[in-house]
A protein has these predicted regions:
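Carbohydrate-active catalytic/glycan-binding domains of CAZyme proteins
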Residues: 1-198
Length: 198
């Protein structure tokens, strides 16, 4: 059971990681060459990063310039707010170096996803989930090394219907940008969970 999974392929090997919540070590890593048989090969972090407290959710792989990035959600020790951190390694199964928070925005910033467009890196996230206002899926340009925000965050989509959007993925194909995201309630006999596209 790997909630909030993220998968990448490097050469002929697939790597998957996902939410570990409060369980240490943090963010398990599994590998496969056929997408059927998987073997756990380690974790992103053996110990929690210095700035974090709990709620280790939704890690997102990204491979850029021969470097493996993982953007992850965790609660910050100093204020108990969920933010997005980033760590890098030369390999998905190698030792990751944590670079601390990359998105510290409002009362919640979760569910990172990376888009590369015309050589520039962008990060998207869910915001305002704990505020008395509609959730928004926000984005911002990243520095070329992928470790810091640059420029002003901008809105991708606003949840005016209050459907609980989160877990967004965005990509570009044939000149169009697509945003895929989860809405409605998850789990149980009355679940109305759905996936939407914009």
């Amino acid at each position: 059971d790997v909630a909030d999974p993220s998968i990448i392929r490097i050469d002929q090997t697939y790597y998957i990681t996902g939410t570990s919540s409060e369980w240490a070590p943090y963010y398990p890593v599994f590998t496969s060459t056929d997408l059927v048989n998987w073997q756990q090969t380690g974790h992103v972090f053996d110990e929690k990063p210095e700035w974090t407290k709990s709620s280790f959710w939704a890690p997102e792989w990204y491979y850029h310039n021969d470097k493996v990035y993982v953007y992850y959600t965790a609660r910050k020790k100093s204020n108990n707010t969920s933010y997005i951190g980033v760590a890098t390694s030369d390999s998905p199964t190698g030792k990751f170096k944590d670079h601390g928070p990359v998105v510290e925005f409002g009362t919640e910033a979760i569910d990172a996803f990376i888009l590369e467009d015309k050589g520039d890196l962008y990060i998207s996230w869910k915001a305002y989930g704990l505020d008395n206002r509609p959730i928004e899926l926000l984005a911002s340009k990243l520095t070329p090394d992928g470790l810091k925000l640059t420029g002003k965050p901008f809105s991708l989509l606003r949840d005016d219907e209050r459907a609980g959007m989160e877990g967004q993925h965005w990509f570009k194909k044939n000149g169009y940008y697509y945003l895929i995201y989860a809405i409605n309630g998850c789990c149980g006999p009355n679940s109305d969970y759905a996936v939407a596209v914009a």
